[in-house]
């Protein structure tokens, strides 16, 4: 079944953006990817109503995923956000709850888990 809303994927590693875009597109999602969070934020400002979900890495230059998520929420308070990090989840719990992210994925993320967690985040 095709999805009508888009997902914004932001990670400073191009390979992750490409793999996520391919995996989610196979499940009918329209996916737009950025390796620069500042450019992603500018794009989101212009197109926020089109996005059902933002998936972002936590650690990226020049803006962290937490900063990006806070900016996304300032633009669209009901935005759904999934953060991902290779670092321990316990170190991130406070920040995740502070911005009210819908989920936190631990890198590396297998594609089956990614698709399942995206479905859950978008349904809530």
Predicted feature residues:
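Short amphipathic alpha-helix used as the core "switch/output" element in two-component signaling
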Residues: 42, 66-77
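Acidic catalytic/metal-coordinating carboxylates
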Residues: 35-36, 64-68
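Acidic, metal-coordinating helix/loop segments flanking the phosphotransfer/catalytic sites
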Residues: 33-53
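The feature encodes the CheY-like receiver
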Residues: 17, 61, 89
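Two-component/phosphorelay signaling modules centered on CheY-like receiver
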Residues: 14-32, 121
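Alpha4 helix (beta4-alpha4-beta5 surface) of REC/receiver domains from two-component response regulators
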Residues: 67, 87-104, 112, 116
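The short loop immediately C-terminal to the conserved phospho-acceptor aspartate in CheY-like receiver
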Residues: 58-59, 119
């Amino acid at each position: 079944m095709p999805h009508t809303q888009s997902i914004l994927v932001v990670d400073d590693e191009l390979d992750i953006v490409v793999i996520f875009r391919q995996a989610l597109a196979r499940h009918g999602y329209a996916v737009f990817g950025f390796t620069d969070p500042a450019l992603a934020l500018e794009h989101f400002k212009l197109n926020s109503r089109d996005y059902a979900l933002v998936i972002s890495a936590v650690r990226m230059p020049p803006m962290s995923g937490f900063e990006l998520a806070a900016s996304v929420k300032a633009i669209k308070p009901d935005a759904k956000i999934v953060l991902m990090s290779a670092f321990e989840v316990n170190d991130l719990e406070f920040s995740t709850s502070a911005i009210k992210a819908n989920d936190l994925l631990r890198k590396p993320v297998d594609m089956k888990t990614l698709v399942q967690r995206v479905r859950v985040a978008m349904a809530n």
